[in-house]
């Protein structure tokens, strides 16, 4: 867990234990249900835990928020963020049942009472959330169209709502229709080569 503590030095002993246990749990589940490429498991902390936590470096969450993770797969970025923010509610959604089973089992094993999960397609979802997070599920235009109805309306001047999207590569063309989008380079936050082209899009 040295890599996580390098960037998140205030992690509690409980959080360090949860992240450590998460590595073992995903190794165990991945041997049974392939939710992460086998080769990628060798870099699990870097490629999945720390990458997910890039959102927290760019846009920290405050207590009491509701966050929706769309297309969570095996639980990313939702599970790592839920460990970091135990007082924020996370709802993790994926259309593939076996992946949601892994999410449920991992969340239960880690004692994450702030995590709920559901097998569903995003267009069938109801409810309202402060933030929607995701990791490169589809093009931003399609993602926004499918999820915008799930964001809580802004009722007070100080309210903050939005989409926090982990993406990579050149996003100039993809984001041309979203002049209000802000792109943050994770290479400015994390020094590892893996993050050279990784970004967080805030919309």
Set out the residue ranges of the language-model regions:
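N-terminal auxiliary segments of SAM/dcSAM-dependent transferases
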Residues: 1-38
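Conserved beta-strand signature within the Rossmann-like core of class I S-adenosyl-L-methionine
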Residues: 155-171
């Amino acid at each position: 867990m040295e890599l996580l503590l390098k960037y998140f030095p205030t992690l509690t002993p409980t959080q360090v234990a949860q992240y450590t246990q998460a590595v073992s749990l995903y190794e165990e589940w991945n041997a049974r249900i392939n939710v992460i490429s086998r080769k990628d498991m060798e870099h699990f902390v870097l490629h999945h835990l720390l990458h997910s936590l890039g959102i927290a470096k760019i846009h920290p969450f405050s207590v009491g928020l509701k966050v929706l993770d769309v297309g969570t797969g095996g639980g990313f970025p939702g599970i790592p963020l839920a460990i970091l923010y135990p007082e924020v509610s996370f709802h993790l959604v994926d259309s593939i049942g076996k992946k949601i089973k892994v999410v449920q089992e991992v969340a239960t094993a880690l004692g994450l009472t702030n995590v709920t999960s559901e097998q569903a397609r995003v267009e069938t979802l109801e409810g309202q959330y402060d933030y929607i997070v995701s990791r490169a599920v589809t093009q931003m235009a399609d993602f926004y169209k499918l999820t915008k109805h799930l964001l809580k309306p802004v009722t007070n001047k100080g309210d903050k709502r939005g989409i926090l999207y982990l993406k990579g590569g050149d996003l100039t063309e993809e984001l041309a229709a979203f002049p209000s989008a802000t792109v943050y380079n994770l290479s400015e936050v994390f020094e590892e080569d893996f993050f050279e082209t990784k970004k967080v899009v805030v919309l």
